[in-house]
Structures are given as structure tokens and as C-alpha cells.
Amino acid sequence: MSAKWERDSDASKGTLTFEIDVDTINKGIDEAFVETRKKITVPGFRKGRVPRQIFNQMYGEESLYQDALNKVLPDAYNEAVKETNIQPVDQPKIDIKSMEKGQPWVLTAEVDVMPEVKLGEYKGMEVPAQDTTVTDADVDDALETKRQQQAELVLKEDKPAEKGDTVVIDYKGSVDGEEFDGGSAENYSLELGSGSFIPGFEDQLIGHNADEDVDVNVTFPEDYHAKNLAGKDALFKVKIHEIKEKQLPELDDDFAKDVDEDVDTLAELKEKTKKQLQEEKDNQAKAAIEDAAINKAVANAEIQDIPQAMLDDDTNRQMQQYLAGMQQQGISPQMYFQITGTKEEDLKKQFANDAAQRVKTNLVLEAIVDDANLDATDEEIAKEISDLAKQYGMEEDAVKKALSKDMLMHDIKIRKAVDLVADSAKQVKDDEKSDK
């Protein structure tokens, strides 16, 4: 086969010209004839039994060309792609240039291909320094959060509601005198100051007592998920049934044992909490360094225009992964769109906004894998399978069936590229930054 690839100037697309040899064409025509004659009736012959010569006299061999092409084109195109070593990212647009009897057929394919990446600096780059210090105040705040979680709610009598109290209410909302879906409830428990209701709603209940009726006037935010309510003024008729206040436990050894069965004293709980906070800060710092360093590596690289097909694929993949995550939490796509007051197109636009950056990042990381000759060993692949099996509670054989060796190798190599970029980065404070 003869194939030629011509890339458009500074673009991730071009024209692939290729031929289909006569032997391959004839085999395709033979197969097309066998299938076609089953469908036609010629006087003097049983259906499906017309001889080839008679068929050619009546219909012409050229009538089989399109069916023959459909049979031989996929393999011919794939061979041309392999011969020219290009990486298509979408279905090609095929054009027939020559289809003559007894001659190779000549075709062209307009193809979007993987963009070329010219790496810039990606090692030893400066990134903002990360503070991983865990202070006593951090530990105190964490313990206070645990206290709040262990608090008991006790009935508050003859005292008005304050921030932090929980009120049990009935409410009914209306806009322009008309009630709306989801705007009413009975015996609803609401913590004042939690920010779980529309801005201003909770504040207007502070200072009121049990058994009071309160008119609450609010304005829905402009970006409110229910588009029919966004930016509109609303009136809520509220009945306060009960007011409850938090009763916090003492910060002592008994409290420590209640929140963590593995400790016996408050001192042990503080030490364990500090270690947990340190691990969290270290992980956050690592992620921040990775993001900053990789973003710089992407900015330093020269990347050709990204084909729309790659952006669309990324957007659809991200959206499906997100909806699958919702499904695991018991929220179907239909339920999600109903709850959020959005449509599938809205979610797609949300993920499309960052598609270009995600695709560029993947392209640069793959280029770094090649540039640094990164690879995945059999031992690393085996460990990856073992780790995934433990993470998802699966048998290792099930992981092997779900994920191909190539997929596992790709993930390992990409992680190595991330580590290479991040581990070589230099943390600098604002007053120490250079031009790097």
C-alpha cells in the first residue's frame, strides 16, 4: 500500500492519501457480488443464482464498487494510518479520488490528529511555598469541631432564638402571592447561622420566641438553581414551634474516649488529632505543588490547536463520570437535574469550560513520559492491580478483566510524570521569586 500524510500548516489536522491495491479491490467486489445477487431476480435464473457474467452485462461491475469499498475501506484506512504513523482522534472524512477498473483505487481522508507538543521547561520550576505547620490553635479548632458534633440539643424555654440555636418551624413561601414548588415544609429543624437557607432567612428568625409567627422577606440569589425563582423577592410565613440550644460536652478524658475508642485521655486525642492534621496539610501541600508545577509546565509548552473532537470527548467523559458518582449516591441523572433545576446541556457547558486545560495537561504529561523515557515495570503493574483490588473490594482477576495492561501502564507512567515535575519543583516564598 502507498500512503502519504500531509499536515496542514501549524494545525492538528491534515490529508491522508492512500491507495487500495487491485487484489484487495477484486476480493471486495467478489464479496459484494455474492451478497448482491442474493437480493435480485433475473429472468431465466433462480433468485440468487445469476452468473457473474450475466450480472455484469445487465448491471455493470461498477454497480458493486460502493459495496466493495465499504468492505475494504476500514482495513485499508487503518493500514494507511499505521504506515504514516499518525494518531487520528476522530472519524475521517473520506473522499474518492480515483475508482477505475483494473487500477488501484485512490482515496483521501481529512483527519484530525493528536496535536504536536513541543515541551518547554518542566523540571526545577519555582512554585509557591506551602506552609505545613500544624499549630496548637489548629488542634483546638479541630477539637472544638468534634465538641460541636457531640453536642446535645436541649429545649430552650422563655428565651429568644440566637445564632447557633436550632428552631423547629413550619414555613410557606410565595412569590408575587403565588406559592411555589419546594417552598413549604412542616416541623423542619433549622440551625440558625448554618447558611442552609436563602441568605437573610435565618437572620430574621433570631430574636423571636417559640409559638411566634414571623414574616420573612428574602430575595433569591441571581444564580439560584431554580431559574424561575432566581433574583425574585419572596415572602415566607413562618411558625416557630420550638427552640433548642446546644449543650456541649466538657473537653476532658471522658469526651476523648467518647469520640475515639482508641484513646484513653484528652492528651492522647490531641496528639492523634495533630498527626491527622499534619497528614492532611502534607497532602494538601503536595497537591498544591503538583497543580502549580504542572500548570507551569503546560504554560511553557507549545501545543498545536486542539481538535474539537478531543474537547468533546473530554467533556462527555467528565460529565459521565460525575453523573456516575451521583448514581452511586442514589441520585439518578433525572433526579439530579430536577434537584438542581438544570439540564444536561447546562452540565455539559460547565465541564466544557475547563476541557481545553485538561486536554492540554494530558498532552504535556504524555509528552513528558516520552521525553523522560518513563516506563512501568511488571512489578509496578502488579502492585497497581493489588492496590485497586483492595481499594474497591474486588478480586485481582476482576481488576485485570476490567482494566487492560496498557491502561494500567498508562496510568502509572502519567503518575511518574506528575511526580517528576512536582518533585523537582522548588518552593519559594513571595519575596524570593525569580523569573523562572
From Swiss-Prot:
One of its GO terms (molecular function) is ribosome binding. Keywords: Cell cycle, Cell division, Chaperone, Cytoplasm, Isomerase, Rotamase. Its main location: cytoplasm. It catalyses: [protein]-peptidylproline (omega=180) = [protein]-peptidylproline (omega=0). Pfam families: FKBP_C, Trigger_C, Trigger_N. It is found in: Cytoplasm. One of its GO terms (cellular component) is cytoplasm. InterPro entries: PPIase_dom_sf, PPIase_FKBP_dom, Trig_fac, Trigger_fac_C, Trigger_fac_C_sf, Trigger_fac_ribosome-bd_bac, Trigger_fac_ribosome-bd_sf, Trigger_fact/SurA_dom_sf. It comes from the Bacteria. GO terms for biological process: 'de novo' cotranslational protein folding; cell division; chaperone-mediated protein folding; protein transport; protein unfolding. Consists of 3 domains; the N-terminus binds the ribosome, the middle domain has PPIase activity, while the C-terminus has intrinsic chaperone activity on its own. Belongs to the FKBP-type PPIase family. Tig subfamily. This is Trigger factor. It comes from Limosilactobacillus reuteri (strain DSM 20016).
